Amino acid sequence: MTESLVLSPAPAKPKRVKASRRSASHPTYSEMIAAAIRAEKSRGGSSRQSIQKYIKSHYKVGHNADLQIKLSIRRLLAAGVLKQTKGVGASGSFRLAKSDKAKRSPGKKKKAVRRSTSPKKAARPRKARSPAKKPKATARKARKKSRASPKKAKKPKTVKAKSRKASKAKKVKRSKPRAKSGARKSPKKK
């Protein structure tokens, strides 16, 4: 009886081995997509349809190739291997993203430049324009600070608080001149 129990799992193991013997007659879809984009060399990128045509004409793929291509395009977009030039999702046009070395070196330079310029811009408006004309200076400050705030990481809280006060002050000051300007305009038209 114990022998019959041992024999039943033995035939199940070879079935698993048979399932792993499958071999594809083509490279991976991601490799085929990259080859299709390289071969097309279009300025605006390659569309999904043109990629599908290229793959079907150059490789032996199954009947579900369109679905596999669409899914692998999405994966490549998420991984950053492809860059989408037009459209949304798997539709549109695609290019191969530039190599990591090319991306990293300009990225570091840009960050360094941003850090050096943002404190200078923030320091100048506070010192130079605060003693100047009050109503115009507050409007200019609020605009410039709101532009500079996304670049800064350390001081956005103080900038936001001041810009809110300035925007409230703007509304009060603007409402009075608008009423006057409206009264002035109506006699001119008549």
Swiss-Prot record:
Gene3D superfamilies: Winged helix-like DNA-binding domain superfamily/Winged helix DNA-binding domain (1.10.10.10)
Tissues where the protein occurs: Erythroid cells.
Phosphoserine modification, residue list: S23, S30, S146, S167
GO CC annotation: nucleosome; nucleus
An annotated GO BP: chromatin organization
Keywords noted in UniProt: Chromosome, DNA condensation, DNA-binding, Nucleus, Phosphoprotein
Compartments it resides in: Nucleus; Chromosome
Database matches in Pfam families: Linker_histone
Domain of life according to the entry: Eukaryota
SUPFAM superfamilies assigned to the protein according to its UniProt record, in alphabetical order: Winged helix' DNA-binding domain
Molecular function in Gene Ontology: double-stranded DNA binding; nucleosomal DNA binding; structural constituent of chromatin
Basic residues: bias regions: 13-24, 104-190
InterPro entries: H1/H5, Histone_H1/H5_H15, WH-like_DNA-bd_sf, WH_DNA-bd_sf
Domain H15: 25-98
Disordered, as annotated region: 1-29, 87-190
Function description: Histone H5 performs the same function as H1, being necessary for the condensation of nucleosome chains into higher order structures, and replaces histone H1 in certain cells.
Sequence similarity: Belongs to the histone H1/H5 family.
Protein name: Histone H5
Source organism of the structure: Gallus gallus (Chicken)
Species classification: Eukaryota, Metazoa, Chordata, Craniata, Vertebrata
